[in-house]
Amino acid sequence: MAKISEFERQRQENIQRNKELLKSLNLDSLSQSIKRELPRASETKKRKTTPRTKAVKKEDVEPSRRSRRIAGIKSELENPEEYNHKKSGSLKFEDKVIKSDSTEPEVKQEEKEELSEDIKNDNKVLHRLQALGDKFSAGDFFDIIQKNPIQYDDKVLQSTRDEFDKLKIYEKHNPLDIKISHTRITAINFHPSTTDRVVAAGDTNGNVGIWAVDSGEDDSEPTISILRPHGKAISRILTPVAEQNKLYSASYDGSVRVLDLNKLASTEVVYLNDPYENDDYALGVSDINFCASDANLLYMTTLSGSFHKHDIRTPFKPLKSKDILRLHDKKIGSFSINPNNTYQIATASLDRTLRIWDLRNVSKANAEWSEFENQISPHLYGSFSSRLSVSCVDWNSENRLVCNGYDDYINIFDLNEESLIPDNLKAFNKIKHNCQTGRWVSILKSKWQVAPEDGVQKFVIANMNRALDIYDQKGQIIAHLTDSVGAVPAVCGFHPTKNWVVGGSASGKVYLFE
């Protein structure tokens, strides 16, 4: 036998010692007991079977017979008024589903004609809805509404509709040739003049285009002049009542400038700086209006939700914190002054609210609602909350407000019926209107005609199906103008007095209906 090495001898001794240790611990018997406790892998659990129950057939229970005489129910002959009342509330096609007892051929023929006409009208509406999908406006159904005499009983409305039916697109030049700005139109203004008509429009690059509508008849091309008074998008263009030879324009670059139409020279009136930042930090101007009771007082709102007023007769000085009023914590898209009480203004904001303010009562206590510290606000009369942002608001001379926003509704408010402006404003009419403009179309904004010559209060708003919709102050549609419109005339407005309408598109072209 070969001699084992020292290492091998120690290894075998360790193995023997471990065996003796395991034996002393009695692990073999313990492992056997564990095995007995564990279920066998091959053994499967048997499912309990329950006896199948037979389905019990339900027997029809016939209703018990009851006497109408004992129950006190009168027959048709005994109570014809109640029968007729119930009959008038029946479903539209109930007589067709439930066979009519009428056997006279003339009655049957008349019923058949009425039903066929109803079905025809309903099918028209159904097909129109299917074609438009979920994004549609009430104006898309104008041809159906106009043909239905049941929808209105108003001679003034009918005559106004007849007048707007005569409106045609401007025919002197091809609408596709009337390009008034280089890029997408963001603001438009119809000058008050009725003889030498002028349309001005601003675009996203700060250009202002001026179109002399009634220039010489021999002109083969439209007479258009384009200037660039601003560095950013133009938010508003207006003509003061007292100075009709001037155009005021506001821009996101923080400035308000005045353009002399005779000299075509532009000068700066206001440059809004943020008082909480350095002087170079501009407050983008979102809207401007002149006060009706003081033609020199210019009201302005900003993209940050603040308000400022300035007398244009005095030189403008850099703003201080006390000069700014906080109206919203987010962008103010539009505001309007009450023509009857110029201390009242209405604002529409990205924060999904419309608010009415009293500019006479200004204090820090009025600004407790704001998330910003040390703010000053006017007194808040009341507000209207929307599901999504409110794009614009406009106030007419008969105390009606109109607003629209991304919730796809036009809301009309009547403040004549209220002795005091309520805390929570409620629209008396809501009109379905598609306002989903997307990235390449300017925001839709409804605008009243300032001083209608025919006495009919009306507003205009662009339709996403390349049209202009016109409504009266009750919310009844007057016109749906589509003639030769090649793009969505998103930015639109009335002539202040005449029933002429103009709209501007994303390509810088304008469509004039006269």
From Swiss-Prot:
Biological process per Gene Ontology, one example term: regulation of DNA damage checkpoint
Superkingdom, taxonomy of origin: Eukaryota
Residue span of region Disordered: 26-116
One MF annotation (Gene Ontology) recorded for this entry: DNA binding
Composition bias, Basic residues: 45-55
Compositionally biased intervals (Basic and acidic residues): 34-44, 56-65, 92-116
Per-repeat ranges for WD: 180-221, 229-269, 280-320, 327-367, 385-423, 438-481, 483-514
Keywords in alphabetical order: DNA damage, DNA-binding, Repeat, WD repeat
Pfam families membership: WD40 (PF00400)
GO cellular component terms listed in the entry, alphabetical order: chromatin; cytoplasm; nuclear periphery
Stated family: Belongs to the WD repeat DDB2/WDR76 family.
Entry-linked PANTHER family: WD REPEAT-CONTAINING PROTEIN 76
Cited function: DNA-binding protein that binds to both single- and double-stranded DNA. Binds preferentially to UV-damaged DNA. May be involved in DNA-metabolic processes.
Protein name listed in UniProt: DNA damage-binding protein CMR1
Protein source organism: Scheffersomyces stipitis (strain ATCC 58785 / CBS 6054 / NBRC 10063 / NRRL Y-11545) (Yeast)
Gene: PRW1
